[in-house]
Amino acid sequence: GQGAGIDLTNPGVTDIECYLNSFTYFPSDHRVLLSGKFSEYGWDKLPVNNITIATNEVASYYKTVALPSKKNNTSINCKIPVFNGGTLEAPVRTFITSNEKVVAVGNITNYCRINTEKSYAESMVLDYSKVASVLRMSRTGELDDSYRRDAEGVIGQILDACMVESDGIVIVGTFSSFDGQSVKNIVKLNAEGTLDETFMRNIGTGANGSITKIRYNKNKKKILITGEFSEFNGIPAQSVVMLNDDGTRDEIFKIGKMEGGLANFACLLDNDN
């Protein structure tokens, strides 16, 4: 098939420099939001910047624009993505909000998009805008300048994230500061991109080591985190903690003693068995 992470001139060889790490459907039309580390998508090598929207059959979703040729200044019809937006660095996760906007989370410093007014058929020109770790875009890729305006972002490294109720986003990793506030490897942003003070108060001192994975069960409204920590909010925790979506600890969840290593992934099933 087609996709990112494949050398289209040598389909049998996987290009490990490219990858996908998020795959999400838009509820209204089932088009697919894809993100990771890639600069082209599909057999037609559609130029993208780590994020794209594909058809519900995961084919390229593009529009045709006439661009001048550097060779003779004639116009050539070129394909560009309908989602004309993206990031300089690969997002860790991307999400679709309840009103079908796109939120990208990661160790991101710049938003970018193709400038069709300055581009040529042979080479696309990108415009860049500074962002701070988390950004929001429209379905066609325009940057939402009102979202997280003048935010500082993360000091450290974001490793994972999940979307919870009301378009909130919980971000985890190895970091000591987020938007100028001292934190311990976990934060929650509300729908407008500011820190959720209730959640931050409830998690207290957070984790005393890296949080590497996070998963959310929307039916049970529970968050599971795993990582290289032995305490969470000052209470012993053997690399796994379950939280309620307000940041309070689920006191019923007790993991058995582990020896010889740490958990690196956990998720909560919908059944109660």
Residue ranges and their predicted role:
Residues 1-273:
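Extracytoplasmic mature domains of secreted or surface-exposed proteins
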